Amino acid sequence: MFTHKIQIRIFDTDFLGHCHHLAPAMWFEEARNEIFEIFNPSMSREGWNLLLVHIDLDFKAQIQFTEREIEIRTRVARLGNSSITLEQGAYLRDGSCVAEGSVVMVYYDLKNQKTMRIPDEIREKLLGERGQ
């Protein structure tokens, strides 16, 4: 399991005083950086090889600015030939889950416009002690 702490920012909130519905999607993406680095250690544009093809997001409770910090937990739910499914959750300090979702990303050769098999060395890192 990969974990990432997010500081809730005032601009994450909306007119009603709770976090805007897009904030968790941005937090989840930020938390995926560690996974992006497994696929592309330099995080260079030239080496970018992941396409997000599906996203789900469910809200379990309101998230207030006063919470100040959210922990995003990410796990590899499925590792296919050329795709990876990640499940993510946003947790308050008391351990309660306030949002959860999943994404499917495809390992892709942008130059040749085709999917590629995820290499074994990447698979090992993804499924290592923190991957599942």
Give the location of each predicted region:
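Residues in well-ordered beta-strands of folded domains
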Residues: 7, 58, 104-106
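Hydrophobic beta-strand-centered segment that forms part of the acyl-chain substrate-binding groove
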Residues: 35-71, 75-78, 98
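HotDog/MaoC-like acyl-thioester-processing domains
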Residues: 2-3, 64-66, 77-132
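Hot-dog-fold acyl-thioester-processing enzymes
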Residues: 1-54, 110-132
